């Protein structure tokens, strides 16, 4: 039995739910794993990696009647495709990025024994009620939908506030992430511009736009291309002025960058 078969069993009764389970505060318990590209920024990924890397070094332990078997599973190979280090790293990463991490049990064929644990990363999940019992219904990005009894899953969360089951989004970081993106874009644009515009030339007469473009290309080809190996630039009297643009290094606002870094590392 593969992991896909475990999460999407064909013979199990499909859970048909018409409405969400309503919590005491009337908040609909659902969450989505889209968080505005939080993991796609180098600074935030670095902070998350540092945390996840430290978590991956931990040694999980289990107490209770199932201790011997589950301890062996957790300490060596929680599931068929992950050892303990990878399992803990992925779990910590999911928790940092989405503030909610779901641990689903893997059962044997007759569902009498837990044979593994897997960190789920659905595109969205919701707590629903069916026959007076809570279920966790989840959907993956490929459209596959599954459901499991809520009391069989483990849920880790942080920034735990409105929802009785899931953590809050990372909306509190949106302003910092926007500043980080703006600074990165500004740095990239400045570097590209300083690397492409090297000379400014002024022609001493009115020229049609198409002729101006042709003259610019001719001037560049003659003086600025690899064909000119002499190091000497020559131009005729039609040019009133030719000036070299000094290429200056783009300097990052160190105070602003330090503030952004502090916000990111304090958050994570």
Give names to the regions the model predicted.
Residues 1-253, 257-259, 263-266:
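Structured, contiguous alpha/beta core segments that scaffold functional sites
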